[in-house]
A protein has these predicted regions:
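N-terminal cap/leader regions of alpha/beta-hydrolase-fold enzymes
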Residues: 1-239
């Protein structure tokens, strides 16, 4: 499906926030999906993912969670700066940003306002989990990829698991040195205990960032399998 992309500006309590929007060229009404960035900004990878999602028949939006920063794009080679920047992200502010993106989707005439999903990677994986709880009335499907720190924070996203209403598909790599497998186990246990409908896939040969083909950690077989599962999951719950 052919897509068109653009940048829109959304209002937040801290000023304007850019968001990358991709949507099918063909008319009609489509589900909406919020794409939440890694700790490197709304870069070419995140824009590409947004456009790939749109090509499957969705209106996709990637809000710039770093809009409060002077540097909003960080190269993959500068992990210290990425970590320092993500540590300045305040959960409540990020939830406001994601809420603005959801509101934008719901306001569009070509979006099915009752069919909104969220997907995120790395930092965005954690925020996807949190958004499924914080925006539970709007989020109908959530897909966190290698969300580090879900068990961390005050309160942690994990502590809000009981608020989640949407089905969730979580992806991790067994060789992820940033997300210990005991954390993944805690997430699995809490989702099960709270009776959240979820699926989880752990790729034995994949590390952190395995889905991003611009990173050295890209693992093609795992990325392709996860993408097929993601497409099927969103189609099942949003279409």
């Amino acid at each position: 499906m052919d897509v068109t992309s653009s940048t829109v500006q959304l209002n937040t309590s801290d000023g304007k926030m850019d968001a990358h929007v991709a949507q099918p060229k063909e008319g009609g009404k489509y589900p909406g999906i919020v794409v939440i960035q890694e700790a490197f900004g709304v870069n070419s990878h995140i824009k590409n993912v947004t456009e790939r999602i749109a090509a499957e028949g969705y209106v996709a939006i990637a809000p710039d969670i770093f809009h409060r920063e002077s540097e909003r794009l960080i190269p993959y080679s500068d992990m210290p700066k990425a970590i320092a920047t993500l540590q300045r992200v305040v959960d409540s502010k990020a939830m406001e940003d994601i809420g603005a993106a959801i509101a934008h989707l719901k306001s569009q005439s070509n979006v099915k306002s009752d069919a909104i999903g969220v997907i995120g990677f790395c930092m965005g994986g954690r925020l996807t989990y949190l958004a499924a709880a914080h925006h539970a009335e709007d989020v109908k499907a959530a897909v966190p990829y290698y969300g580090g720190g879900i068990t961390m924070g005050n309160p942690s996203p994990l502590s809000r698991t009981g608020e989640i209403k949407a089905p969730m598909y979580l992806f991790f790599g067994a060789k992820d040195q940033l997300i210990p497998m005991d954390q993944v186990g805690q997430i699995n246990t809490e989702l099960t205990t709270r009776k959240v409908p979820f699926q989880m896939k752990i790729y034995p040969e994949a590390g952190h960032g395995f889905f991003c083909d611009e990173r050295g950690s890209y693992h093609e077989a795992s990325a392709k399998d996860a993408w097929e599962k993601t497409k099927s999951f969103f189609a099942q719950h949003l279409k």
